[in-house]
Amino acid sequence: MKVTLPEFERAGVMVVGDVMLDRYWYGPTSRISPEAPVPVVKVDTIEERPGGAANVAMNIASLGANSRLVGLTGIDDAARALSKTLADVNVKCDFVSVPTHPTITKLRVLSRNQQLIRLDFEEGFEGVDPLPLHERINQALGSIGALVLSDYAKGALASVQQMIQLARKAGVPVLIDPKGTDFERYRGATLLTPNLSEFEAVAGKCKSEEEIVERGMKLIADFEFSALLVTRSEQGMTLLQPGKAPLHMPTQAQEVYDVTGAGDTVIGVLAATLAAGNSLEEACYFANAAAGVVVGKLGTSTVSPIELENAVRGRADTGFGVMTEAELKQAVASARKRGEKVVMTNGVFDILHAGHVSYLANARKLGDRLIVAVNSDASTKRLKGETRPVNPLEQRMIVLGALESVDWVVSFDEDTPQRLIAGVLPDLLVKGGDYKPEEIAGSEEVWANGGEVLVLNFEDGCSTTNIIKKIQKDSDK
């Protein structure tokens, strides 16, 4: 199926809400502390990622949309780290600095893919003057297609009702990820996106989909919402709108590693899609696909346009399919955090034949994920001659990405993938043919990183060149 993504580049979205910094400390655990019955983690990796409303803004920016973020921070290292990280991913920040408060920070300690503890550094922003937030919203209303209010009950949305009225008066849809049981404060919102537990905390326990629909429609009427989207984890999503039949969407997640930030991804994709001019139903479709991708990643994460397109084409997982080099590196980093072994190979793969399929299947068996690096058209011409490739790069990559054995496909323009391999550093580098390991491009870099290099045999009698010769011979008859 050919999927047409929304025109995200023409979408402008402002996110207002509780901004926070997520810190992750990773390391191995091999002993128990003599001081107390707790594991000792030897921290070897530290990561900092924007969280809360900042993660929503990152999700919007990762799609290529114009993302603006407004929130409350302290004047500290965490605020500076947030500003720098967000600027690097094209989020325009306009924070209101509160000198009496620290920037909200969540520190998570992980070992062997397990979160051991979370430490929160925060002081609620309740009582802070909301006027600077209102001014920033007013200034942006003429240039945005959606306003997201991201509520984590930390005080940034204490005046949420005034914010809703400002946007609705300007004709800008308001999307809210709610917190708590007081839905009255969100009265008049365009769309509310509670998860099932948040929904049932307000509407009561539901024993069936019929009860979810009935009670959801009552909430819409009681609080004058335009729509309600209930996210239901492994049961997917349910969209409710007055005068329309309920829309149930099954989950697209294949594996669930971490639900951290999944709600941020959902509302971010919803807002960007609506701001691009698509319908609410279409926005929910893309948001559901994006949720299936992001829960397969560890920690708060974003979804790229390529990952989203792969997901709606039926390749929903940790960015499987055709990728850019930057997206590949991110996917590999996530795989390593899950303890997966990454295998990498490369080639032209011009006319895919049984020998290729067998070789790639055997390579995949050597690890958990298989990367296939493909020569670009220009690289192929230099290597094979002016008549090659027969199939252009895009078609070669799509065919490879459709193979069950292949997880990620990426292209390179050079004569060899040495630079690409040095950047990815797979655990195992594989090449087919009669090479010696030391002759394989990238082998030195992989060995230096502690990885392995292996030569696999191709299936006898299978050759793209022979296939081309046979076609030419038959056409001459």
Curated annotation (Swiss-Prot):
The gene is hldE. It catalyses: D-glycero-beta-D-manno-heptose 7-phosphate + ATP = D-glycero-beta-D-manno-heptose 1,7-bisphosphate + ADP + H(+); D-glycero-beta-D-manno-heptose 1-phosphate + ATP + H(+) = ADP-D-glycero-beta-D-manno-heptose + diphosphate. Homodimer. ATP binds at N195, L196, S197, E198. Residues 1-318 are annotated as: Ribokinase. Its EC number is 2.7.1.167, 2.7.7.70. InterPro entries: Bifunc_HldE (IPR023030), Carboh/pur_kinase_PfkB_CS (IPR002173), Cyt_trans-like (IPR004821), PfkB_dom (IPR011611), RfaE_dom_I (IPR011913), RfaE_dom_II (IPR011914), Ribokinase-like (IPR029056), Rossmann-like_a/b/a_fold (IPR014729). The active site is at D264. Residues 344-477 are annotated as: Cytidylyltransferase. Keywords: ATP-binding, Carbohydrate metabolism, Kinase, Multifunctional enzyme, Nucleotide-binding, Nucleotidyltransferase, Transferase. PROSITE patterns: PFKB_KINASES_1. SUPFAM superfamilies: Nucleotidylyl transferase, Ribokinase-like. GO terms for molecular function: ATP binding; heptose 7-phosphate kinase activity; heptose-1-phosphate adenylyltransferase activity; phosphotransferase activity, alcohol group as acceptor. This is Bifunctional protein HldE. It holds the Pfam family PfkB. The keyword Nucleotide-binding applies. Pathway: Nucleotide-sugar biosynthesis; ADP-L-glycero-beta-D-manno-heptose biosynthesis; ADP-L-glycero-beta-D-manno-heptose from D-glycero-beta-D-manno-heptose 7-phosphate: step 1/4; Nucleotide-sugar biosynthesis; ADP-L-glycero-beta-D-manno-heptose biosynthesis; ADP-L-glycero-beta-D-manno-heptose from D-glycero-beta-D-manno-heptose 7-phosphate: step 3/4. One of its GO terms (biological process) is ADP-L-glycero-beta-D-manno-heptose biosynthetic process. Catalyzes the ADP transfer from ATP to D-glycero-beta-D-manno-heptose 1-phosphate, yielding ADP-D-glycero-beta-D-manno-heptose. In the N-terminal section; belongs to the carbohydrate kinase PfkB family. In the C-terminal section; belongs to the cytidylyltransferase family.
